[in-house]
């Protein structure tokens, strides 16, 4: 089979197209024929490494945490999927050398494989994983919020999504709307505002406006209940100014820097909760619950992709995976997909 591998960290040129053997799944594993692979920032960050020359944990690595395809074989004890099922994958490559989705067949643990609803496309499935599960987690950690999402779970809540044109922001808007929240989102300009509006946000604001706090307070006079935050260092003062008493701020990225300063007394007085989250260490039970509720949203038609849904798709074939990584690393707006097989 054809696969993309890298044997050293570096820029996209370290990615190579090679032939690898198709392997059989062991106990608790599934072999999936990958149709579409989704590319996320975590993929290029792992490939580039934290520092020049950083050693890999394996001799070589197949990249790609997310994807969608068809189950080809199952190992002993697998009950959640069967041969022939259409599925989506999450965290496929985590702590595994050759389970990534940038290859024609992936063998991976069954608990990273989820049935894809009949009404959902492979493009939708490959666009879930990291973005949708991250968004789900961010929406279910509030002190006064739900632990699971379903229609009505966020009824009466005001959710502020920072960066509504990003992949996580897009999923957060759609999941929050499906769960009944009123959604405010902030973006950098008109083009991204159009995408966030298409995703379903009722209120789309430009975060560079000098009166952004007043604009948010006009929409939510008592403050927002939950914030899905992509840039905590950049937005900490804004978040403090608009969060309500007992509100929660879920941080999933470090856009704008790793260091932030908080006014402790003001956060005391508001009983603010900061929740930092990383999918790799969040726990299998959280991932499983997220997948169940994400599938319910998919079945309801609430998680859609494409420019008309606020998430433009950019496509390359497997041989040009380096181009896909370069697009994501360069900040392409939307979702970058790799067509792996038919």
Description of each model-found segment:
Residues 234-303, 340-342:
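Glycine-rich phosphate-binding loop and adjacent beta-alpha segment
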Residues 21-39, 51-94:
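Glycine-rich beta-strand-centered segment in the early N-terminal region that forms part
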Residues 126-209:
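Mid-domain Rossmann-like dinucleotide-binding core that forms the NAD(H)/NADP(H) cofactor-binding site
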Residues 86, 158, 182, 247-248, ...:
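Short glycine-centered segments of the SAM/dcSAM-binding site in methyltransferase folds
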Residues 211-221:
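Short amphipathic alpha-helix with an adjacent loop that forms part of the alpha/beta core around
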Residues 288-342:
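C-terminal hydrophobic helical "lid"/dimerization subdomain
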């Amino acid at each position: 089979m054809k696969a993309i591998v890298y044997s050293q960290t570096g820029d996209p040129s370290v990615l190579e197209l090679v032939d690898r053997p198709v392997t059989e799944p062991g106990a608790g594993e599934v072999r999936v024929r990958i149709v579409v692979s989704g590319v996320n920032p975590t993929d290029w960050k792992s490939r580039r490494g934290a520092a020049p020359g950083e050693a890999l944990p394996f001799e070589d690595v197949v990249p790609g945490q997310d994807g969608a395809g068809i189950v080809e074989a199952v190992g002993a004890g697998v009950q959640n999927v069967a041969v022939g099922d259409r599925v989506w994958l999450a965290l496929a490559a985590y702590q595994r050398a050759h389970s990534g989705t940038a290859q024609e067949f992936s063998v991976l643990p069954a608990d990273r494989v989820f049935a894809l609803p009949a009404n959902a496309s492979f493009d939708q499935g490959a666009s879930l994983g990291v973005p949708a599960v991250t968004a789900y987690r961010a929406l279910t950690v509030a002190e006064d919020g739900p632990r699971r999402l379903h229609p009505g779970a966020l009824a009466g809540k005001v959710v502020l999504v920072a960066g509504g044109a990003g992949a996580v922001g897009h999923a957060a808007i759609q999941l929050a709307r499906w769960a009944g929240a009123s959604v405010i989102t902030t973006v950098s300009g008109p083009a991204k505002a159009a995408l966030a509006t298409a995703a379903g946000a009722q209120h789309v604001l430009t975060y560079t406006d000098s009166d952004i706090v007043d604009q948010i307070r006009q929409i939510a006079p008592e403050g927002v209940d939950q914030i899905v935050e992509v840039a905590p260092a950049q937005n900490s003062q804004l978040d403090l100014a608009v969060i309500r008493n007992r509100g929660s701020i879920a941080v999933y990225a470090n856009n704008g820097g790793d260091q932030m300063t908080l006014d402790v007394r003001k956060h005391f007085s508001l009983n603010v909760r900061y929740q930092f989250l990383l999918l790799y260490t969040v726990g299998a039970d959280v991932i499983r619950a997220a997948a169940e509720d994400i599938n319910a949203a998919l079945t309801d038609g609430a998680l859609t992709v494409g420019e008309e849904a606020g998430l433009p798709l950019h496509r390359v074939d497997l041989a040009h995976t380096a181009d896909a990584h370069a697009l994501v690393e360069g900040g392409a707006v939307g979702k970058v997909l790799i067509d792996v097989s038919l």
